[in-house]
Amino acid sequence: NPTNLH
């Protein structure tokens, strides 16, 4: 899972 989703 990506950690830097805005």
Swiss-Prot record:
Keywords: Hormone. GO terms for molecular function: hormone activity. Has an oostatic activity. Inhibits trypsin biosynthesis in the midgut which indirectly reduces the vitellogenin concentration in the hemolymph resulting in inhibition of oocyte development. This is Trypsin-modulating oostatic factor.
